[in-house]
Amino acid sequence: MSQGHTGAPKAPVVSFENVRKVYGHVPAVDGLSLELRPGETVAFLGPNGAGKSTSLDMLLALRKPTSGRIRMFGSDPYHAVKAGRVGAMLQSGGLMPEVTVRELVTLVTGFHPRPLPVGVTLRRAGVASFADQRVDKLSGGQTQRVRFALAICGKSELIVLDEPTAAMDVETRRLFWNSMKEEVAAGRTLLFATHYLEEADQAADRILVINKGRLLADGTPSEIKARAGAKRISFRLDQVNEPFLLGLPALVNLEVRHDVVQIQSSDSDATLYAIIDAGYRPREIEVTSLGLEQAFLAITAEDDATNGLIAGETN
């Protein structure tokens, strides 16, 4: 938690209080409550249709919640957006064609209540090298970087990014996150939604996992991984007996490729002891914690299974 000079906690940059957004009878966001503190880098993770984009749209005052309350810097999000306190990079919306990158950034900067010098924005967004190219002639990755330039062209305190590295190649993604580190170092708060879980693992100091519009997990990358409660066991085994392996205690998942066995287990000791007690002699044994992707899948799968069971009981 961020602290002020007096040691008292700083007020949250963003707060959602039991927010719901319903389309017809279908909740896209269902009782979402969360807070973002100053200086945090927060990843927003969830499968397609989880409610990430709807939540970001409501945060940016593009949609109104059906019920609940959203606050940005202590007031309605509309006022913070109008004052230029937030910059955003969304998936939807095109860029003006037949103008250069420099011309577009200059135009948007001119409307910003708290503008940065255009040259500073071009450099920080990593678009200076193609600033004189036309926007409609850029690659997908370059276009994304221009969107980023528009998001940071002012002295915004909060930056909101929805799938920012889509269409970027590996090198462009690396350069993008280097740019983001500069923004965070300058004291900005960052909230980003992504499908690249390795980015969340490396860049975020906090991760929010949502599914069906509900918050399932909130913690550091390490805490989210531990939340899954399983470990991966990998080893080589002569004469693999799949029926035996499928009956192992604490088994969560099994993959066999030739003589290589990979197991997800909720109790790695019990699983390994059962293999050895049965007379098998596994080689090259490795026991590791699940990666963020496996933890994310386990958390959302558990939620899906629980909801499916509840739905079945009510039918």
What are these regions (language model features)?
Residues 60:
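Helix-to-loop junction immediately C-terminal to a conserved catalytic motif
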Residues 178-266:
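ABC transporter nucleotide-binding domain
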Residues 106, 110, 116-131:
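Conserved ABC ATPase "signature" region
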Residues 159-163, 168:
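Catalytic Walker B motif of ABC-type/P-loop ATPase nucleotide-binding domains
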Residues 68-82:
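Conserved ABC transporter NBD signature motif
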Residues 170-172, 195:
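Helix N-cap at the start of a conserved alpha-helix in ABC-type nucleotide-binding domains
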